[in-house]
Amino acid sequence: MNEKERFGNFTLWFTGLPSSGKSTVAKLIENELLDSGITIENLDADDLRSNLHPDLGFTKEERGINNRRIGYICKLLNKNNVASIVAAISPFREYRNVVRELIEQEGRFYLIYVKCPVEVCKKRDPKGLYEKAEQGIIPNFTGVSHPFEEPTEEEYDITVDTSKLSPDQCAEEILDYLRDEGILETVDKYTGITESEEKEIKKKLQDMGYL
């Protein structure tokens, strides 16, 4: 296994209310990781649901099945040294824990809680789903007629509040955390050296008076 492959066995799982900003922040993280030379797949939870298992509804049990199926895909990707990003509401702690246990059989799992007050989410909602849910048009809608079990400090790995920070600021906080975890300590796709090696080389060149 080469240095680049060694850093592909992880999953970033974004959880939060509808319209909290999960997908927006996840996309920013994906772009940064791709630029760092990491092979990664950004799995759209809605697309997976509609294409792989359109028969599923939105009861607690069906949401759990959906989460487990996505988790299994992440597990397979991680097994093959492909990192994965998932932005899914994942409202129930029980199934978030199931997904963690499943993925950690092959890789590292990071739960990222994208926090945002429901009133702010409603104002952001571009499709008017909250309004339709409040009118009874959409049943089992998280944040209205279905609960969201907020992740605790013991459960999530990092949290960002999109009502207080911009998407870019949220992404940078997450990236700082991933740097601390060594996730961004990857092989550069052109030079084949790690960030720490690059810093060491620059320091030596500075000591020698070249920089």
Regions found by a protein language model. Name each.
Residues 195-211:
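Short acidic, low-complexity intrinsically disordered linear motifs used
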Residues 14:
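Hydrophobic anchor at the beta1->P-loop junction of P-loop NTPases
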Residues 22:
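Conserved lysine of the Walker
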Residues 18:
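The conserved Walker
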